[in-house]
Amino acid sequence: LPLRGKILNVEKAMQHKVFENQEIINIYTALGVTVGTEEDSKALNLEKLRYHKIVIMCDADVDGSHISTLILTFFFRYMRELIESGHVYIATPPLYLVKKASKKEYAWSDDDRDKLMEDFGSGTSVQRYKGLGEMNAIQLWETTMNPDSRTFRKVTIDNAGEADRVFSMLMGDEAVSYTHLTLPTTTIV
């Protein structure tokens, strides 16, 4: 499901605005989930869930991290059952393609890039991906979509209180800049 730009920041929005937002309506529709079960009228109903892996795939840069955080905030606040049931993952596209002659490797960080450049030696070229749209279909498949070579980070909630605090800190009215914040790594799948 392609989202257009940044999803609504549900941390700051009134609840009625969340459910009026077209991108959020599209997420509910695409996933096939509804609100309300026989036991709890406010619980997320996963009976008709269409996908068992919901993959958040954003650019590998700071803007992509911000969009991922907006989406994760939505899932945490409104679809927490999906996270608790192990359905939510984050794709990890590379930041760089490092090439020399016929050798090529992808790098997911500046440190990875620097090591590859050192290993490849002089004559190495580097392509930085500003976004997923800059990759051709083959590159996107090789790095982010191919089940044999992709890396997904499974989203888990180890401490709901701490997660609540972090989402409020990052996305709330008194949000701090998260460009320098290091969050714990998640499970690699």
Spans of model-derived segments:
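Conserved phosphate-chemistry cores used by DNA topoisomerases
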Residues: 1-181
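Single conserved hydrophobic/aromatic residue that forms the stacking wall/gate
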Residues: 180-189
